Amino acid sequence: MELSDSEVARPREMVPACLLLLLAESPGHGYQLMERLKPLGFDWHGPGPIYRELRALEEAGLVTSTWAVGPTGPGRRVYELTAAGRASLDRSVAGVAGLQGLVAQYLDRYRRLPPPRRTVRRAAS
């Protein structure tokens, strides 16, 4: 099995916490949130995964949504953080801080590894 950089560097388990963080900053609709996740390292080819996460957060009572009709274009579901969502966000910080420590240890140990050995093939005679 080979791990890609995106599988390791951007664990899917961080998406709900990142969505809660973004909604604590300001409410938003799915496409906005998808764009706001990009600087955090998450980039999807479509909004499906974001809407699934938002639906799960709403079912858990961590976010609410309202239908907003804009002056132009179709209406959109706008998501907001609830008090329970803020409490969940506050609790998630300890877990994220733990990940930060784990990543720091991982990188430190990786940097101390000896360089890879090269194998020399002998030419066939």
Regions found by a protein language model. Give the residues of each.
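N-terminal helix-turn-helix DNA-binding core of bacterial DNA-binding proteins
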Residues: 7-51
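Amphipathic alpha-helical dimerization/coiled-coil segments
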Residues: 87-125
